[in-house]
Every structure is written in C-alpha cells, then in structure tokens.
Design a protein with these regions (language model features):
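Short His-Asn-centered micro-motif
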Residues: 96, 125-129, 154, 211-213, ...
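Conserved short loop/turn motifs at secondary-structure junctions
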Residues: 9, 122-131, 213-216, 331-335, ...
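Conserved adenylation A10 loop of the ANL superfamily
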Residues: 78-84
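Left-handed beta-helix
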Residues: 1-70, 220-447
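Conserved core of the sugar-phosphate nucleotidyltransferase
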Residues: 133-279, 283-289
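Beta-strand elements within well-structured catalytic alpha/beta cores of enzymes
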Residues: 74-78, 209-211
C-alpha cells in the first residue's frame, strides 16, 4: 500500500503506466515469478515448432503478394542505447556498413519492398524514454521516403528500492536513473495505450512483425526460431509445458539446471525475438488484461543503492495466443550486432549489402560464421574502428582471438585459426597485406 500511494503521487508518468506498474508488482509479490518445474518440460514437436522448409511458398502473383503485404506492419524495438559499445544515443544509429546505420538499413529494406510490390508497409519504432528524443530528430531525415514511420514510447516504470520497496524517484532520485523501461514484453500494452493499435486496425492492418532493431537478419520474411550455436547458449528457447508452447528464459531456470539449459543437445533452438502477431488478437488480449508474461526480476545498483526492476519478454506472450507456433528458421534470419566482434563480421567480406539487406557471401563454404573474440581494447566502436585500417578478409577464417594493443593494416587476410596476443606494454601492428593462416602471434618476430 505504501508503494501504491507513492506511485500515485509520481507526476512524470501516465495513469496507464501507474496501473500497469502496480499490477506487475502485485503479480511479482504474489509469487508469480516462480521458477518452472523442470520435470514438466518437454521438447516441442514439429507441430509446434515447424521446420522452415515445410512452409508453403508465398504466392507468385504480384497482386496477391501486394494484398498480403498491405495487411502488414513492421515494428522494431528501438528502446536500447549503444552504451555497451561505447556509444551515446540509440543503438540503432550505430553505423553498420557503408556508412549506413541499423535504422537506415531498415528504412531502405521497407522502401524497396513497398516499391517492388506497390504496397504500403509502415514502420513503427517503439522507443524508450532513453531513446525517444534522439529518435524523433533522426527520423526527420526519412521524411521524403515512400514509407510511413510512426514512433511511440514504451512504458516508463520507477525502479524499486530493494530495502523498503518504495519507488526510487519518490526518494529524491529526480533524473533518468530513477526509471527503467520494463523489457520488450511491454510492446503489446504500449502499442495499445499509444493509440497506434486502433489506428492500424482501422487502416485494415492485420499482422505485425516485431523484431530487435539490431538483428540484421530480421527482414520481412516469416516467431522464428533458429538452430542454436555455442554463441547463443544464454538465449531463450521454446518448450512444451503443460500442453502449451512457451518461452523459457535463463532467468526462470533453477540454478542446478542452468548447465543443462545451455546445452545444445537438449535445447536445440533459441528465440530470435522475431515475432509475427495478429493485431486483432493483441487488441483482444490486452483489453482482457490476459498477457501475464513471466516476470524477470533484474537487480541493479544506482549510486550505491540496490534497486529492482521487473521486466517481461515479448516472446513469452506466445502461451496466451491460441494455436501459436514457432518456426525453425535458417541461421541467416538471426544476425544480431551486440558487440564489436559482430560488427567485424558484418563489415567484412563475409557479407555484402543489397537493397539494405546484409547478405552472406556465397564464397563462404562453411555454414557457420567464424568465432571472433576481441580484447577490451576493441570494445568501444571508436577504438575498434581506429585499430583497423580496413576490415580484414575473413571468408576462410574459422576463429580469431585478439588480445592486447594490436592494430591491423589494410588488406590483411585471416584464414583458419588465428590468435594474436600482444604482450603487456608492447604495440603489435599487423602489416598491410599480411596473410595469416593458422597462426599464433605473440610478437613482431612471429609475423
């Protein structure tokens, strides 16, 4: 009740946000964030996770395709900042390739789709209070494009002080640090609260494709799930549980089963967070307040104060939709850029850029991408760019490990397994045009 009273007095947020927050906290306190009963988990069958190649092909007829696409809306989750990569502002404005940002590529893709089929697929961006102002300025540059861009904000919830369970903003924390965006599970109520859902339904739109703005593989094609590789061991997976399909995230796994959860044998698929959802169903479920997704408690510290933020994931909503299925899609549908090592992949000759689509180079024989580990010297985008005169050729690379003060000249070719480790205090420069194949380099003498 103290929390309820304190929240009621917060002037910065709407009544919808207040009631949404209070109901999330009530669910959390009633023990709904409980972990799952491990023995009840079953691997989903092909009926609920459908193999991609068994899907019916889209109609050949252009008019039929146009009619389908005219019912579609693309929604990108744009609430994240580029802080982990050393950038201020929205992550979607990091330059990915040829000077284009994530957002540029998304706009170019939808433009070419609209042009090709004569359709009008709009783009929605769900911002957070962290990215809203910057995004509003950035989208102005697309005002001449053939694409309608709508933005709306996801909810802004107060962080809870762990000690006395009161909102941080009512304890004198006036800045942004007092608040948090409650995860992308919030996309459904926020789409409704913003009025955008009703607008889209009134325009005859029927489906929304939801994806992370940093997943370059999330182009308009068809919830998708892809074969798990070792890089994805922490990602959520789809399971059958008490007769329904649901998303299982690592936060819900009992400690003694975490290693089993990470195993590629038992859980072969993971959630790409590419979701295809019926807009009318969203409206019906949001109005009925039926979307009670699993709560993920995320403990943080703000200026030495321990706080709690309660979050939900969009994919977890799958169990509230009747007849929901997963689709096991090719790896190409999941090309996320979470770190500069991913940036190295997408800026290299492993990919080309066509109509805003990042497409894999057919010259790459192996189906999987090389594994890349870069040391902390490469963590920030600016430092990463400064250490490469040009991005090396990695079409024949299996793995690369770089540590220490290393920089690369132009036209470098890396093949097989390459490890480069500069000793402390030593600056190691890989010369222009160097070809390194299955090499261990610890100093200039090894080049």
């Amino acid at each position: 009740d103290n929390l309820r009273d304190a929240v009621a007095k917060l002037g910065e947020i709407s009544e919808n946000e207040k009631s949404g927050f209070i109901s999330l906290v009530s669910r959390y306190l009633s023990g709904e964030a409980e972990q799952i009963e491990w023995s009840k988990i079953q691997t989903p069958t092909d009926e609920v996770v459908v193999p991609y190649d068994t899907l019916a092909p889209p109609p050949e007829d252009l008019d039929a395709m146009k009619a389908l696409l005219d019912k579609l809306v693309v929604l990108k989750l744009n609430g994240g900042l580029g802080t982990t990569m050393g950038c201020t502002g929205p992550k979607s404005v990091i330059e990915v390739r040829n000077g284009f940002t994530f957002l540029d590529l998304i706009v170019i893709q939808i433009e070419s789709l609209n042009k090709k089929y004569g359709c009008s697929v709009p783009l929605l961006l769900m911002n957070s209070f962290n990215t809203h102002d910057d995004t509003q300025k950035i989208v102005e540059k697309y005002s001449n494009s053939n694409i309608e861009i709508h933005t709306f904000n996801q909810s802004q919830y107060p962080r809870i002080v762990t000690e006395d369970f009161l909102p941080l903003p009512s304890k004198g924390q006036t800045g942004k640090d007092g608040w948090y965006p409650p995860g992308h599970g919030d996309v459904f109520p926020s789409l409704n609260n913003s009025g955008k859902l009703d607008t889209l339904l009134s325009q005859g739109k029927e489906y929304v494709f939801v994806a992370n703005s940093d997943n370059l593989g999330a182009i308009v094609d068809i919830m998708e799930v892809t074969p798990k590789t070792l890089a994805d061991v922490k990602g959520g997976t789809l399971i059958s549980y008490e007769g329904r399909v649901q998303l299982l995230e690592i936060a819900q796994v009992p400690d003694e089963h975490v290693n089993e959860f990470k195993s590629i044998e038992k859980f072969k698929i993971f959630n790409t967070n590419n979701l295809w959802v019926n807009l009318k169903a969203i409206k019906r479920l949001v109005d009925a307040e039926a979307l009670k997704m699993e709560i993920i408690p995320n403990p943080k510290e703000v200026d030495g104060v321990k706080v709690l933020q309660l979050e939900t994931a969009a994919g977890a909503a799958i169990r509230f939709f009747e007849k929901a299925i997963g689709i096991n899609v090719p790896r190409s549908r999941f090309l996320p850029v979470k770190a500069t090592s991913d940036l190295l992949l997408v800026q290299s000759d492993l990919y080309t850029l066509v109509d805003g689509y990042v497409i894999r180079n057919p010259a790459r024989v192996k189906p999987s991408n090389p594994s890349i580990e870069l040391g902390p010297e490469f963590k920030k985008v600016a430092n990463f760019l400064a250490r490469f005169k040009s991005i090396p050729s990695i079409v024949e690379l299996d793995s690369l490990k770089v540590s220490g003060d290393v920089s690369f000249g132009s036209g470098v070719v890396l093949k097989g397994n390459v490890t480069i480790a500069a000793k402390a205090g030593v600056k190691l420069e890989i010369p222009d045009g160097a070809v390194l194949e299955n090499k261990d380099i610890n100093g200039p003498e090894d080049l």
